[in-house]
A protein has these predicted regions:
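N-terminal pre-P-loop "Q-motif" helix
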Residues: 11-28, 228
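Conserved SAM-binding loop
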Residues: 63, 93, 245-246, 278, ...
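Helicase P-loop NTPase motor core
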Residues: 32, 36-44, 108, 114, ...
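A basic/glycine-biased coupling hinge at the interface between accessory DNA-binding modules
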Residues: 2-4, 9, 27-30, 35, ...
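Short alpha-helix plus adjacent loop in nuclease-associated cores
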Residues: 99-107, 250-255, 284-285, 376-399, ...
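Alpha-helical scaffold elements adjacent to nucleotide-binding pockets in ATP/GTP-utilizing enzyme cores
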Residues: 47, 73-81, 99-103, 128, ...
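Conserved helicase C-terminal RecA-like lobe
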Residues: 163, 360, 364-365, 372, ...
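Conserved helicase motor core of SF1/SF2 NTP-dependent helicases
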Residues: 38, 219, 223-302, 306-312, ...
Length: 499
C-alpha cells in the first residue's frame, strides 16, 4: 500500500484530466456530467477513496446509489484503493432506500411509531389496496398512490387537488391505505424516503445533526432522482453545500416512475457556485456508434450539452433491420447469429437485449427450434418468490405477534383449510377487540373461537397457535434445531415439492 500524500497522487494516476478535476474537488457543490462509458463509476469511487486518503473522516461521507449492485461495486472498488487501516470505520455507501431504512430504525419514534415496522413490497401493496377497493384498477391505484407520495402530497392534499370524481375516489383510497399501514406498522418503499423527509422537515435540530454528521455527500445517477429525493437531499445538506452529484442528462428514462430531468438540468440554480465537470471521453463504444449517438441526441432540447469522444477504433457500421412481425425478427436474428458462429465468433460474445421480458418468448422458441443454446439473464428475484415471502411472514410472526398483515398471509400456508371467510371474520373480531389476530387466537379458548369461525376451524387454529408458540421457544436455541423443527412442523418442503 502507498500511504498518505503519495497514495493520493497514485489514486489519480490512471484518470484523464476531467476525471482528475472531479476526483480532487473537495468543498462546495459539484455536478459531474458523465456520458455513457466515460468512466463515471471509476471517477466517483476514486473521489471517495481520495477524500479518505487526504484525512477526511470516512464516517462523514455519505454516498447514495439507486441499486444495491452499484453500491456494492463502488464499495469494493473504493476500498481496494486504500490501506485497510484507513477504513476501520467505513463510509456509508448505500441506496436511497437503504439510507431511509437505517434512518427510520433510529428515528421512527419521531412519528409516534415503533421501530419494528415491516416493509411491504409491491405485491403486498397490491393486496392491501385490493382489500380496500375492488372497483378501480389496482395497478392505477398503486401508481397514483406512489405518485402522490413522491410528490409529497398527503391524502387531504390529494383530495383538494382532485378535479375528477375518479381522482377524488383514489385520494380517499389513499387515505384508507395510509391508515392501514400506520395501524399495522407497515411501510412501503416510498415511505422509506417520505417518512425520513417528514421527520427531518419537522425537526430542524435533528436535520442539522444529520447534516453535520454527513459533511460530504455523493449521489449517483442523479438524472433519475424525483422531487422527494431532491427535497431530502436539500435537508441532508442544510448545514453545508458539499454535494457532488453524477449523472447524464441524456439518459433520463424513468419519468414514468416520478424521476424529473429538471433536478439535473437546474442543479446549478438549486446550489449556488456549482462546479460543473464534463466527462466526454468514451471508453466503451466505437466511433461509429458514438457519432450516430451524438447526432441523434443533439435533437434533444432539454440538455446541458456534451459530446462523447471515442478512444477506440471506428468499428463496424450499424445495421437496422425492420421486420414484419416478431417471428420474422427472430428468424433474422438466428440467421445472423449462425453466420457469426460459422465465421469463428465465440457464442459467449453474442448478446441480445430487449426492453421487456415478454419479448423473450419468440426468441426462446426460435432458438430452441434452431438448436441454439442460450442463457436467459434476469427473471424473478429470490425475495419476490411466493414461498420465500411466506417464510419471511412466518419469521415476522415469530418475532412480532401483532403483525396481522403477515399472519393473514400464512395462516393457510401450507393449506390447512382456513379460507378467506374465516380470515375475514378473525380480522373483523381483531378490529373490534383491538387485539391482533394471533393474540385473539391465543387468548380465547376453543369454544370462544368456535363461536366466531366454527368448531373445525377452531381446532385448526389452536394447533397453529401451539406450533407457533413451540417454535418461539426454540428461536433462541441452535439454528439447525429451530429450522429442522420448523420444516417438520409445517412440512414446507413437501408442500412446495407438490406445486
Amino acid at each position: 500500500y502507498i500511504i498518505g500524500e503519495k497514495m493520493s497522487e497514485n489514486l489519480l494516476s490512471s484518470l484523464n484530466e476531467s476525471q482528475k478535476i472531479a476526483a480532487q474537488h473537495i468543498d462546495g457543490p459539484m455536478l459531474i456530467l458523465a456520458g455513457a462509458g466515460s468512466g463515471k463509476t471509476k471517477t466517483i469511487t476514486t473521489r471517495l477513496a481520495y477524500l479518505i486518503s487526504i484525512g477526511i473522516d470516512p464516517r462523514s461521507i455519505l454516498t447514495l446509489t439507486f441499486t444495491n449492485k452499484a453500491a456494492s461495486e463502488m464499495r469494493e472498488r473504493a476500498f481496494s484503493m486504500l490501506d485497510s487501516s484507513m477504513i476501520n470505520t467505513p463510509p456509508l455507501l448505500c441506496t436511497f432506500h437503504k439510507f431511509g431504512l437505517l434512518f427510520l430504525k433510529f428515528h421512527m419514534s419521531e412519528l409516534n411509531r415503533k421501530n419494528n415496522f415491516i416493509i411491504i413490497d409491491t405485491d403486498d401493496k397490491k393486496r392491501i389496496i385490493k382489500s380496500i377497493d375492488k372497483e378501480i384498477t389496482t395497478s392505477l391505484l398503486v401508481a397514483e398512490i406512489s405518485r402522490y407520495k413522491n410528490s409529497l402530497l398527503t391524502p387531504s392534499e390529494a383530495k383538494s387537488a382532485a378535479q375528477l370524481k375518479l381522482y377524488q375516489q383514489i385520494a380517499e383510497i389513499y387515505e384508507k391505505y395510509e391508515e392501514y399501514l400506520e395501524k399495522n406498522n407497515l411501510v412501503d418503499f416510498d415511505d422509506l424516503l417520505l417518512l425520513p423527509y417528514k421527520i427531518l422537515k419537522n425537526n430542524q435540530k435533528l436535520a442539522d445533526e444529520i447534516s453535520q454528521k454527513y459533511q460530504y455527500i455523493m449521489v449517483d445517477e442523479y438524472q433519475d432522482t424525483n422531487e422527494l429525493q431532491y427535497r431530502l437531499l436539500r435537508l441532508l445538506c442544510s448545514s453545508h453545500s458539499n454535494l457532488c452529484v453524477v449523472g447524464d442528462d441524456d439518459q433520463s428514462i424513468y419519468g414514468w416512475r416520478g424521476a424529473t430531468i429538471k433536478n439535473i438540468l437546474n442543479f446549478s440554480e438549486h446550489f449556488e457556485n456549482t462546479h460543473v465537470v464534463k466527462l466526454e471521453e468514451n471508453y466503451r463504444s466505437t466511433d461509429t456508434i458514438l457519432n450516430h449517438a451524438n447526432q441523434l441526441i443533439e435533437h434533444n432540447r432539454d440538455r446541458l450539452g456534451k459530446k462523447l469522444i471515442g478512444t477506440r477504433q471506428k468499428g463496424d457500421s450499424i445495421r437496422i433491420y425492420e421486420s414484419q412481425d416478431e417471428n420474422e425478427e427472430t428468424r433474422k436474428i438466428i440467421e445472423d447469429i449462425k453466420q457469426l458462429i460459422d465465421s469463428g465468433t465465440n457464442p459467449k460474445n453474442i448478446a441480445i437485449l430487449f426492453r421487456v421480458n415478454a419479448l423473450s418468448r419468440s426468441l426462446e422458441e426460435g432458438f430452441n427450434k434452431a438448436g441454439l443454446n442460450y442463457k436467459l439473464v434476469g427473471g424473478m428475484k429470490f425475495y419476490e418468490r411466493s414461498e420465500i415471502k411466506d417464510l419471511i411472514a412466518y419469521f415476522r410472526i415469530l418475532t412480532n405477534s401483532n403483525d396481522n398483515f403477515s399472519i393473514k398471509r400464512i395462516i393457510n400456508k401450507p393449506k390447512r383449510g382456513i379460507g378467506k371467510t374465516t380470515i375475514d371474520k378473525l380480522e373483523a373480531k381483531s378490529i373490534e377487540s383491538g387485539k391482533s389476530i394471533f393474540d385473539l387466537i391465543q387468548q380465547l379458548d376453543s369454544e370462544e373461537i368456535g363461536s366466531i369461525v366454527g368448531k373445525k376451524n377452531s381446532r385448526t387454529l389452536k394447533v397453529f397457535e401451539a406450533s407457533i408458540l413451540d417454535l418461539k421457544e426454540l428461536l433462541n436455541e441452535s439454528k439447525m434445531k429451530f429450522f429442522d423443527s420448523f420444516e417438520e412442523t409445517f412440512d414446507y418442503r413437501a408442500s412446495y415439492d407438490n406445486l
